[in-house]
């Protein structure tokens, strides 16, 4: 016992050694206090083994080694004869980790940070680490302006040397900026400078960017904004001397003072480009031209550097170094730009790889590549491949990396990392309006069938007035050169009278095929043939309908009022279709920049029962207002025109319509434009030699049924904004926009007669009867499929128009 006490004293006070100069030989090692840690694991962590001769240094190393495992709070080493006794106190095991009071920081983020610090369920608790964790979390709150915040770790002991760990947060309130002072500005007012900041001491109601809540990171960004503002206006000697952030005694107010030196404005005296230009000096000099007397501009200097890097990157110089050293002449207030360029090595591409395409086949991605293996690297070609993959619409995100090949000086591998989205959808649409009630439609579409890139779809509608089924198939790479082949088969039974359209029934079916030919990266042409059969019956006498029938030589007999004509009409038509498409959108879903446009034409070829042509145009352009693409303006234009050939008219069943979620939101589908003007022939005239509807009066009591027209124009403008309360993780899956829609449909062949004027029928030949609506839309690419909601209120409407304020579509995705 005396030996044990003496050994403890020597370890604690290091005043003497009990082992003598030669130490002693360890015959056995015995542990006391082990519970969770196995004896074998403890022995492996020690530098001492049975049979070793040890001294004071070995004992010290043993204690340090055991502490280094992180499993023990206390370690003592004692000697009992030739047995080494190791007494330990294990750190308690964490049984649970909980949080309380944290509103600004999510539990998942806290757990992730704690685990990075070694604090997780099932691990030993290091009490010393809790202090630094508390301080680190409090520092985070201070950085976002919550200076009264506190974080306390509460450890509750449990049986079997376990503990519950609970972090208790008292967040407090964010300190608000009371005043921002700028000292040293002469050329520009403080108000003008502060107006460019995110942090503000005053925020008007319309400013959705400004913030009075102090955040250290935002202040750093505002200081950089201030620096760039002056450097872009020629103040080459501008400097921020100091920044003071003062806190009020109650920790609820912040005063910010920025001390700066403006200096004088400097002009550019010239640009000198030196170094290894890889034989592209003429092109580089063209990128660095400046006008005589031009003010120094920091942003322009940065742009020059980036342009030089992009230029060299196009020729395979993947890692050029471009450094600009401004040579400032204070005497004449000029700056000479010395641009040093080192193009570095030129690289070949060894492999182009794809990662993350679990469904899509490699060939589907590889055929979109413009950067070839074995060729010189071209950064523009690599980026072009990324854009083309994004444009497919198969992927939620596409990233690209260029990595050097180890041990090879002039080769790189290009890897595209994709995150696939669900491209198969079973969807149905629902609409609700005060006049229309509820309507439904359904469809199945797989845009990347079995990962082949082929599109297969079947869509259908079944309701009170329509039974419609369509099967479609498109192979975008029917040939290796990118010629596409598409086809469709459809069947449609349509009872227009039940759809608030003019009275008739049409049973139609058809088949069609289209070939597409790429012209360049963004343009393509297509040509196709269609066959369509239409079987019309139950046609109620109506002005534009009877005008068409008369043009094709069908003259129904006159019947009395409230009796439908017994006239039937069948048409077999063959159409030649041609079209042009342009697309340079940055991605297929939720684009932020670029334009998509298409123009199409179809004409009935000889041998058809009808003779007419139809033209359509559709264009949508996106203009980002911010570099992040969170604020975007979108404009869309749709137009159409159709006309008969010779004395023939356009079939009334192939008219243009507008209204609904795809054209003018806020209006019921297809209800904008000309309405039916039904003939109402008196019964006493029928059968008395009266054989023409032209002399019958018009029923002025029933003019609400839409008939469409042969011309259409629809305009839309949308402001796409960041969706509130959505984290950056889901920002690419949700889109919110405010919109204004406008559109009209008219009949260029309409002529008012004495009877139509008497009945008060409007002039349906006018193109100026524009309908307008405004509202808000929300689109969400949810795990269950695409969800689209819109609420719109008609701003300008006409008699007979039918509103449908709330519309949404719901889809199920596999």
Curated annotation (Swiss-Prot):
It is found in: Cell outer membrane. It holds the Pfam family Omp85. The keyword Signal applies. Disulfide bonds: none annotated. Keywords: Cell outer membrane, Membrane, Repeat, Signal, Transmembrane, Transmembrane beta strand. Part of the outer membrane protein assembly complex, which is involved in assembly and insertion of beta-barrel proteins into the outer membrane. Constitutes, with BamD, the core component of the assembly machinery. This is Outer membrane protein assembly factor BamA. It comes from Pectobacterium atrosepticum (strain SCRI 1043 / ATCC BAA-672) (Erwinia carotovora subsp. atroseptica). The lineage of its organism: Bacteria, Pseudomonadati, Pseudomonadota, Gammaproteobacteria, Enterobacterales. The gene is bamA.
